[in-house]
């Protein structure tokens, strides 16, 4: 089976807010879907966390290396792409685009063999996983109402992030966390994401340590990105002294960037994003390195349905990954596939067991947000 085309289409029209200093608009493209087409009619899909123009520019570089190549060798092919483009540097648009291509190739391999990607990655440790509802922080009363509604829908784990946290004063920070814990109850998992990768983030180590102690009083399961993303020494000191686990890593790409964080003990929980880290192949390598060093991996996933499906397959194949991020209220997750995502009675999400990623894109729904004919070809 040979690769005949690689296409891309950005999602627009329902882009959710990101909590960033320069806030997103609904027509901004931050998620781009990639499709790899083959001479046997199979099409694999992947998701990339960047703009359509950057993905298409990167594919112009990568396409000559892909056309005519074996479509059933994802890891070898992706590593060849990384090595051939080494002179452009690690990370950036090339790595982001390779992320989508790599996952699309895994999807193809699964379709061709009739197996879910998780089994091809080494075997399924679980057939369902706990998703945590991920949402932006708000003023305490509004946040309480939002979380109460999600709790009523069956969610049992929650992450609140960004918003005014760490950006106004510490009294408001505690009021926000107290309102969240009150809403979700004493037994639910509650995580806090400070959003330290924000370009305007100004807090440092001493704030992070004080805040970690406050979060411990509310039973917070982890404290995410409390520091700027390059402050590895401060992260290492914080992890040693914090009473709550420290997580981060969503802005890093390629396994080499994660190595000093994992080996140096800077994080309790590492959070690569499969849609920009280098793809499924790269995230799996990072996961096993983390496992060998006693670091848990929970993938970052401000995501699409394709990205979520990828995270689910990875969660099935990694022994320590028992949580996945689920961005609540995003049509790019809830409205792209023929089968809707549904929590079971325990608040768990079943991991698709069909071939490949185990999902089918709904052309009619997808057409609301991108040029589906460009991505998947004209419907026959």
Model-based region annotation:
Residues 46, 133, 159-160, 191, ...:
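Short catalytic-loop micro-motif centered on adjacent basic/acidic residues
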Residues 93, 102-142:
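Glycine-rich, aromatic-flanked loop segments that form ligand/cofactor-binding clefts
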């Amino acid at each position: 089976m040979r690769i005949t085309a690689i296409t891309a289409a950005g999602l627009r029209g329902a882009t959710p807010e990101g909590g960033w200093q320069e806030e997103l608009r609904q027509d901004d493209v931050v998620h781009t879907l990639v499709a790899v087409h083959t001479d046997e009619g199979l099409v694999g899909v992947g998701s990339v966390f960047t703009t359509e123009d950057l993905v298409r520019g990167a594919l112009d570089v990568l396409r000559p290396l892909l056309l005519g190549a074996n479509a059933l060798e994802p890891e070898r092919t992706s590593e060849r792409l990384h090595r051939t483009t080494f002179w452009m540097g690690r990370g950036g648009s090339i790595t982001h685009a390779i992320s989508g291509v790599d996952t699309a190739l895994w999807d193809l391999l699964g379709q061709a063999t009739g197996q879910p990607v998780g089994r091809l990655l080494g075997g399924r440790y679980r057939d369902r996983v706990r998703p945590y509802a991920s949402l932006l922080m708000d003023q305490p009363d509004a946040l309480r109402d939002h979380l109460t509604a999600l709790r009523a829908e069956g969610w049992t784990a929650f992450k609140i992030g960004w918003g005014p946290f760490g950006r106004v004063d510490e009294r408001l920070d505690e009021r926000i966390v107290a309102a969240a814990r009150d809403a979700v109850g004493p037994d639910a998992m509650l995580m806090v994401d400070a959003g330290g990768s924000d370009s305007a983030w100004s807090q440092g180590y001493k704030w992070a340590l004080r805040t970690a102690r406050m979060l411990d009083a509310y039973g917070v399961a982890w404290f995410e990105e409390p520091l700027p993303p390059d402050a590895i020494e401060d992260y290492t000191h914080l992890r040693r002294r914090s009473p709550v686990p420290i997580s981060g890593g969503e802005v890093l790409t390629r396994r080499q960037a994660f190595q000093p964080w994992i080996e140096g003990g800077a994080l309790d929980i590492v959070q690569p994003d499969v849609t920009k880290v280098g793809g499924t192949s790269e995230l799996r390598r990072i996961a096993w390195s983390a496992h060998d060093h006693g670091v848990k991996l929970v993938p970052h996933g401000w995501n699409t349905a394709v990205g979520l499906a990828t995270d689910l397959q990875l969660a099935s194949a990694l022994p320590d990954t028992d949580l996945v991020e689920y961005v609540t209220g995003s049509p790019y997750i809830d409205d792209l596939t023929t089968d809707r995502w549904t929590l079971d009675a325990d608040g768990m999400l079943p991991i698709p067991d069909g071939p490949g990623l185990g999902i089918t894109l709904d052309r009619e729904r997808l057409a609301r947000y991108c040029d589906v004919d460009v991505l998947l070809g004209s419907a026959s």
